[in-house]
Amino acid sequence: MERVARKLFTDLDAQKNFCEALIAESSKRTAVAWINEASNTPSFHVDSAEKPQWIPEWIDITGAEEQPGRSSEHESGKIYCLDPSSVFALAPLFSLLANEVKDEINLIIDMCAAPGGKGIVSWRNFKPQLIVANEVMNKRTAALISNYKRCSIAPSMITSCDPGLLASLVSAVADLVIVDAPCSGQSLLVKGMPAPGAFHRATIALNERRQRRILANSASLVRPGGYLLYATCTFSIEENEKNMYWFCKTFPDFVTLPVDTLAEFSSPHGRGDSYRLFPQHGYGAGAFACLLKRSGVAERLPIDERVAQVVSSVRPMWSAGVATG
């Protein structure tokens, strides 16, 4: 833990604050995403004073004493609850909406989708013609399907493909690919969960290699002019900024994009536009986010043809609002 802290912060007080925040009891705020229209009279208390600018108006923040996950709104699929730091990781996508790119995002592929939060919030943000939620670990797909069903996310497909297989089935089809990558899970400590070996060099190196493989396969899924969001819930530079440096060097047709609402969270460790939320900021367990755009617009297939290509090529475990044949 201390070794990672020294890499992240040169200031001794900052190192101390980081380590203390990792093991301190979390504020346990909850972010509540309204799947359709937000209620003016929710059954839980909303703390509007605690809402930072990077959270859109249709996502509320509740205090630690509230339990929106046990509310009638949750049971009926009107809301999805997640850690505020997960919303931070998606903030670059909200900037696309603000920059009037919404109409360009019609096909989304979420590569590491379980339990579904980032895909569901992205669907709410863009309302695409199709979202594909992929989860390679079969034991995690039950929760993913359950959440998509409960929130009535459609048109949607849930798949369980290795990233390499998915990349071999379809190419250059997605307007947006989300890679919320499996990682060393260092932020689990903030949630009071065990994270054995999360700060060990071998664990970090293993995840770095795994993340690069997922990123490499994800790159081929992005259509020219499309976007890729890379996010983790860990703190090691190797799994975050170094991966982005490697990715941009390996795939020079991708460039990082600035996110104005996250300017104060800009990472000092990256050469591009990447952003970090730490547990000492008080909004959840922590996150890293970087948004990239693929250059080019030539030979871009119409969205209907791209959706048809995905539907005909990829066999889903579950789907809604899609004629898969």
For every predicted segment, state its role.
Residues 1-325:
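S-adenosylmethionine
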